[in-house]
Structures are given as structure tokens and as C-alpha cells.
């Protein structure tokens, strides 16, 4: 069945029906649903594993399921396929890309890398399989600092593709790196002025921010960390109010873990409140999740040569971050 035919397929299923059908398909296919914190709440609730990029990569590596359904964006599903060549990996919507991954075209990065032949390449996991294949080590926002700190000080490092995460690491660790100038549109659009206004409105609130944000925003944060780190911090903190400076999907799990606490999404520079939602992540819906499992498509595929080349830096990451 083609993508167009699948999209036209009539669905007369309620939300509850979809939940039930997805659970049935999990058993029939021996499938596991992995979902990122930035997915819509319904998908988060039906997922077998909910996590950030590092958690989901680890789960993809160890799962016994025959089919991996990845509710996230394309590079995440690619990573699952790289780690599981003999398993079917499904993505609810193949158009669910990533502005950060798109900001680092392989042909341009290959030329950039050639200009610094004595540097090793550490690439943020938010990149294509082709960029992973050009890298020495992959990192996530959870383990980036730990991995960079393990590299000898005299060794030059190219850090790609996120300039904001790279700049944050340089400041925290105190070493220079050669940065590729890529960025995430969602994390770059948060408004410093509006954030200051929220801090005035909620004077007792702690500001939790993702390191993909710009430095002018990060300087107002009480805590900076990965999505999982922000979630864990909000659970452990004695504070009752938080301003959350990342994709607003994370707030769903924060609220579930701490129902008596208040979580306020940070505002963007745009007037619409939807700007702190990743448009790529939100292409996946509960209906598309059901249909991709029912029809076992769209499926992630790649050449074995590319998979093996991209596997090495991912395995290096998993080895160094144990």
C-alpha cells in the first residue's frame, strides 16, 4: 500500500479504540513502541519506552522485539536501524525530519572536515546517518560533556552539528572546539525578553533549559540539561513552579510525575504558542502510529556500507558512556 493510499484510508476509531488496536498490534507483531518526550501526549501514553535520545538508543540496542516502532524523528529511527539491521524499524511519518539534522548537509560537512585533518569529530546524535558515518564519536545532550572530557586536551575536536550545544560545552569544560554552525529551530526561537517577563510573573519558579538554546537564554536558567535531566530535576526539586525552556511535549511527563507542581512552557519570539512545539515531531499522530503498525510501513532502510560506517561512532558512544 502506498503512502497516499494509507493517508486516505478512512479511520472510524476513537482514541480508546486506537489505544486498544495498537496494544493488539504490539502483541501480533512482537513490536516495541519507543517514543521521545517531544511526541504528542497520546503517543507518549501508548509507548512502551519513553525517553530522550540516549535512553532510546540504549533501548533500541537491547530490545528483543522483532519490530521497532519509533515515534520520533527520522534520525532517531535511523539510529535504531543502524543498531538493529535484522529488525524492521517503522516510523509513523517519513516526513518527520529535524531542522538541526538538515542544517548539516553531508557534502558540505565532508569538505569542512577535510579542512581540519588533525581533528576528531564528535557529532551530536541529532544528525543523519551520513554525518554519523563521517564522525568518530556520537554524543547526546545527556552524555556530551562526559564524552568531551575524555578526549585529551591537546586533541583538536570538531563538534557538529549544534553550535549552541557546542558553545555551552566549551564554556562549561573550558576548552576550544571547532564548531559546525547548525542549530535547532525550536530551541533558537525562545525569547529572552518574554522569559524575563515570566520570571517576574512567577518569582518562585526555577528555569529549566536545554543546552540547544542560545546562550542569551541559558544565562537565565537555574538548571541546564538534557530532557531526561530536566525531568529528573523537576521531580527531585523542592520547588513547586518551573519554567520549561525546551519543546513543550516534555511537560506532559513532568506533570504526570509531579501532578501538584506547575510547569510553564517558555514563550517563543513568535506570537503563536505553538512555536515551542517541534513541527517535525508533531507530524507523528496516534492515527499514523496505528496505521504504520497495521501496514508495516513506512520502513527505515539503508545500505549496509552506510550502516556499518555509522555504527562505529554510535558503539563508541555507548561504550564510553557506560
Curated annotation (Swiss-Prot):
Pathway: Cofactor biosynthesis; NAD(+) biosynthesis; quinolinate from iminoaspartate: step 1/1. The keyword Lipid metabolism does not apply. GO terms for biological process: 'de novo' NAD biosynthetic process from L-aspartate. Iminosuccinate binds at residues 36, 53, 124-126, 141, 210-212, 227. Its cofactor is [4Fe-4S] cluster. GO terms for cellular component: cytosol. [4Fe-4S] cluster binds at residues 98, 184, 278. The keyword Metal-binding applies. GO terms for molecular function: 4 iron, 4 sulfur cluster binding; metal ion binding; quinolinate synthetase A activity. Binds 1 [4Fe-4S] cluster per subunit. Its EC number is 2.5.1.72. It is found in: Cytoplasm. Signal peptide: none annotated. Keywords: 4Fe-4S, Cytoplasm, Iron, Iron-sulfur, Metal-binding, Pyridine nucleotide biosynthesis, Transferase. It catalyses: iminosuccinate + dihydroxyacetone phosphate = quinolinate + phosphate + 2 H2O + H(+). Catalyzes the condensation of iminoaspartate with dihydroxyacetone phosphate to form quinolinate. Belongs to the quinolinate synthase family. Type 2 subfamily. This is Quinolinate synthase. The gene is nadA.
Amino acid at each position: 500500500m502506498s503512502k497516499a493510499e494509507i493517508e486516505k484510508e478512512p479511520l472510524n476509531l476513537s482514541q480508546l479504540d486506537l489505544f486498544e488496536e495498537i496494544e493488539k498490534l504490539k502483541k501480533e507483531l512482537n513490536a516495541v513502541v519507543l517514543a521521545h518526550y517531544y511526541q504528542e501526549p497520546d503517543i507518549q501514553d501508548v509507548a512502551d519506552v519513553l525517553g530522550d535520545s540516549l535512553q532510546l538508543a540504549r533501548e533500541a540496542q537491547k530490545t528483543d522485539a522483532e519490530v521497532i516502532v519509533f515515534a520520533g524523528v527520522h534520525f532517531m529511527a535511523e539510529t535504531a536501524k543502524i543498531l538493529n539491521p535484522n529488525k524492521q524499524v517503522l516510523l509513523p511519518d517519513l516526513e518527520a525530519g529535524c531542522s538541526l539534522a538538515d542544517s548539516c548537509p553531508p557534502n558540505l560537512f565532508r569538505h569542512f572536515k577535510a579542512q581540519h585533518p588533525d581533528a576528531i569529530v564528535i557529532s551530536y546524535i541529532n544528525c543523519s546517518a551520513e554525518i554519523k558515518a563521517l564522525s568518530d564519536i556520537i554524543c547526546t545532550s545527556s552524555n556530551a560533556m562526559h564524552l568531551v572530557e575524555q578526549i585529551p586536551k591537546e586533541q583538536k575536536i570538531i563538534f557538529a552539528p549544534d553550535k549552541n550545544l557546542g558553545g555551552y560545552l566549551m564554556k562549561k569544560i573550558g576548552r576550544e572546539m571547532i564548531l559546525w554552525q547548525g542549530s535547532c529551530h525550536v530551541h533558537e526561537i525562545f525569547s529572552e525578553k518574554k522569559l524575563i517577563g515570566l520570571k517576574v510573573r512567577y518569582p518562585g519558579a526555577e528555569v529549566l533549559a536545554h543546552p540547544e538554546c542560545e546562550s542569551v537564554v541559558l544565562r537565565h536558567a537555574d538548571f541546564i540539561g538534557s530532557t531526561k535531566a530536566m525531568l529528573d530535576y523537576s521531580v527531585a526539586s523542592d520547588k513547586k513552579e518551573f519554567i520549561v525552556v525546551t519543546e513543550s511535549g516534555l511537560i506532559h511527563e513532568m506533570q504526570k510525575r509531579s501532578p501538584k507542581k506547575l510547569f510553564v512552557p517558555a514563550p517563543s519570539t513568535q506570537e503563536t504558542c505553538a512555536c515551542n512545539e517541534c513541527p517535525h515531531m508533531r507530524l507523528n499522530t496516534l492515527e499514523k502510529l496505528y496505521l504504520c503498525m497495521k501496514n508495516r510501513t513506512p520502513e527505515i532502510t539503508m545500505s549496509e556500507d552506510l550502516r556499518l560506517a555509522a555504527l562505529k561512532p554510535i558503539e563508541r558512544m555507548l561504550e564510553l558512556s557506560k
